[in-house]
Amino acid sequence: VHLTGEEKSAVTTLWGKVNVEEVGGEALGRLLVVYPWTQRFFDSFGDLSSPDAVMNNPKVKAHGKKVLGAFSDGLAHLDNLKGTFAQLSELHCDKLHVDPENFRLLGNVLVCVLAHHFGKEFTPQVQAAYQKVVAGVANALAHKYH
């Protein structure tokens, strides 16, 4: 991902304020509610029968935190996203058979959640930088797909 110095600074400054557990759980929960077909990858998560059930599901929250932990690793290695996400790409492709489009959907949901949490601080410039990052992460996660 090519970010200017200003964009990198905007991304890392805001990310330093992100509650990974809260934002991760909300982002994954919203993905599962807004795009219900993504729920099929989470059969072991128990009750996903309603938006409330999804948003309050402890397994959704825990996995959302894990997902954003990996995203944090990506932010620390913006110049090598493909390398950073190579193993996760392989796992999601070969073992989990996740449609790579879901990575793009989750990235866009994450941007919405960040905008919701940070309001005016999430300026159009910050959003543009984050859109570049989530697109880069989605591409890196899709890299191992045949």
UniProtKB/Swiss-Prot annotation:
UniProt binding sites for heme b: 63, 92
Quaternary structure note: Heterotetramer of two alpha chains and two beta chains.
Modified residues (Phosphothreonine): 12
Keywords per UniProt: Acetylation, Heme, Iron, Metal-binding, Oxygen transport, Phosphoprotein, S-nitrosylation, Transport
Residues carrying S-nitrosocysteine: 93
Cited PROSITE patterns: GLOBIN (PS01033)
Residues recorded with modification N-acetylvaline: 1
GO BP annotation list: hydrogen peroxide catabolic process
Domain of life of the organism encoding this protein: Eukaryota
A single GO molecular function term of this UniProt record: heme binding
Domain Globin intervals: 2-146
Modified residues (Phosphoserine): 44
Hydrolase as UniProt keyword: no
A cellular-component GO term for this protein: blood microparticle
Protein name: Hemoglobin subunit beta
PANTHER family per record: HEMOGLOBIN FAMILY MEMBER, HEMOGLOBIN SUBUNIT BETA
CDD domains, per database record: Hb-beta-like (cd08925)
InterPro entries hit by this protein: Globin (IPR000971), Globin-like_sf (IPR009050), Globin/Proto (IPR012292), Hemoglobin_b (IPR002337), Hemoglobin_oxygen_transport (IPR050056)
Keyword Acetylation recorded: yes
Task performed by this protein: Involved in oxygen transport from the lung to the various peripheral tissues.
Tissues where this protein is expressed: Red blood cells.
Protein family (similarity comment): Belongs to the globin family.
